[in-house]
Amino acid sequence: MNREKLMKMANTVRTGGKGTVRRKKKAVHKTTTTDDKRLQSTLKRVGVNSIPAIEEVNIFKDDVVIQFINPKVQASIAANTWVVSGTPQTKKLQDILPQIISQLGPDNLDNLKKLAEQFQKQAPGAGDVPATIQEEDDDDDVPDLVVGETFETPATEEAPKAAAS
């Protein structure tokens, strides 16, 4: 194509200014405020009440803790619904454990012991050896292997005895 033809075509395709083609459909940007308004209206129908003076919420999931500092907490006990709003921070359980020990009551001491056992099992090196020993102790039906012996030798010795009887 000629350079002159390209220049003419470029002039017809303008991005703005007088005589440009308008968009037929307006782009709709969905914002989070509309979602929040819908959620709040649904929560009003459920009948949630705001719970004031909550400084911290920790949600435990696997080995991760989702922590909310100064959240907005709403609850509906009749609907078994709890809403925690705020900015979450994801932390490892090991990092947050020293802070929450003082908050745990006597009921949760058993849970704390279970968590400590899990950490010992997951610890590299020393934690792996006791776990394998426990697994070996659980297998009472399986005989232990002895160096130099196979299971075939006792089986071949017992076969002639059984045939002789």
From Swiss-Prot:
Start and end residues of each stretch annotated as Disordered: 120-165
Low complexity biased stretches: 144-165
One Gene Ontology CC term in the entry: mitochondrion
Keywords associated with the record: Transcription, Transcription regulation
Domain NAC-A/B intervals: 33-97
Gene3D superfamilies from the UniProt entry: Nascent polypeptide-associated complex domain
Record-stated family: Belongs to the NAC-beta family.
Annotated PANTHER family: TRANSCRIPTION FACTOR BTF3 FAMILY MEMBER
Assembly description: Part of the nascent polypeptide-associated complex (NAC).
Protein name: Nascent polypeptide-associated complex subunit beta
Organism, scientific name: Arabidopsis thaliana (Mouse-ear cress)
Lineage: Eukaryota, Viridiplantae, Streptophyta, Embryophyta, Tracheophyta
